[in-house]
Amino acid sequence: MENGDVMKAELYPDIAPNTVNNFISLVKKGFYDEVIFHRVIKGFMIQGGDPQGIGIGGPGYSIKGEFAQNGFKNDLAHTPGVLSMARSMMPDSAGSQFFIMHKAAPHLDGAYAAFGKVIEGLDIVDKIANVPTDYNDKPRVEQKMKTVTVDTFGVDY
């Protein structure tokens, strides 16, 4: 984070292979660097990945949604720290925006492509979830990802 806070997550290519591949590709391009968490709802989730910072931006393409309601086996529950792809009402509309669960939201299970989990820095998710927001759930003080990196442990993506 811009303030020096660090979150680390593990990704699950066995659960959502295309989603993980897309996320890693965007990370490697520096797509998420200097991007804010533009939507923050305490007790629910924090959302980022829009380079415009307003909730409508993306990479210029969308990917197939890897979740049960869209014909994919994905049993990763939306519990605290889980990463999942944000999308519109259309199941195959995710691109770059993702959210990190602040609290459990079982109503999202099977309806959104969960693909990873925060393994270090869950307190940072909590900290971001507790910042004051405006009427659009946008933090009054930017919560910016300074640099997002990935370690694939020798696996090519």
Residue ranges and their predicted role:
Residues M1-Y157:
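Cyclophilin-like peptidyl-prolyl cis-trans isomerases
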